[in-house]
């Protein structure tokens, strides 16, 4: 099921999702839904003991994003807001949980990972709706790396170019599966920023495309192609 007035922004770390989310929401008179990091009670403990807190870190993120998703969909349906533009949808959470599971140190055990996926499925099957349009911002990993450096977030300093390359591969797989299920995907090359009026025009154009939604899709259940080599890299993987 789709929610009219719900636009998702997807893409790797550093591509520019937050900036587009805010600018696009302002242009459409929608509400911007940004990622929240400061309120995570597991964050500090996770960085001290990733294996001990990896599972609960992901469960907290899933629960937080689920509550956020349910609230804004309800507000749209009741006419309290025109719509939302969301920086990283709940559908992408499974990408990062899976990376922790496939880490050489098994930062999330197979048992915990499967329990997490069951929890995700139960939430999705009962409550969640797909965005009207999912905008995928596509850029080279090298470009994303440069942008990460420019914004200077301390917790992102352990991110490597190899990680960004593999993350991009996982995102490409995610987008292909979502598109195969009939979700409208607006793929934008984000090597350079596109003017907001042009993005708005493309959104209106894609909104007229018929939906071919045929089945429920559970993104990214296949084994990942990347095994982070160090615990330091894993800090970056679970962060965003």
Model-derived features: where do they sit?
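Conserved substrate/cofactor phosphate-moiety recognition/catalytic segment
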Residues: 26-64
């Amino acid at each position: 099921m789709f929610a009219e007035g719900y636009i998702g922004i997807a893409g790797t770390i550093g591509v520019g999702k937050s900036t587009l989310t805010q600018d696009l929401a302002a242009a459409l008179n929608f509400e911007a839904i940004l990622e929240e990091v400061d309120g995570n009670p597991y964050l500090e403990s996770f960085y001290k003991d990733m294996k001990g807190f990896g599972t609960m870190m992901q469960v907290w993120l899933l629960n937080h994003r689920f509550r956020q998703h349910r609230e804004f969909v309800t507000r749209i349906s009741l006419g309290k807001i025109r719509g939302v533009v969301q920086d990283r949808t709940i559908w992408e959470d499974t990408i990062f949980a899976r990376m922790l599971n496939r880490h050489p140190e098994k930062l999330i055990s197979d048992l915990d990972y499967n329990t997490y996926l069951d929890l995700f499925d139960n939430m999705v099957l009962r409550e969640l709706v797909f965005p009207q349009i999912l905008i995928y911002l596509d850029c080279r990993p090298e470009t994303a790396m440069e942008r990460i450096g420019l914004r200077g977030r301390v917790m992102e300093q352990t991110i490597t170019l190899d990680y960004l390359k593999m993350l991009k591969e996982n995102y490409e797989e995610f987008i292909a599966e979502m598109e195969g299920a009939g979700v409208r995907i607006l793929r934008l090359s984000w090597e350079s920023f596109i003017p907001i009026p042009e993005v708005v025009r493309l959104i209106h154009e894609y909104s007229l495309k018929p939906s071919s939604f045929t089945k429920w899709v559970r993104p990214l259940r296949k084994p990942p192609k990347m095994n982070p080599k160090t615990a330091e890299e894993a800090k970056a993987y679970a962060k965003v």
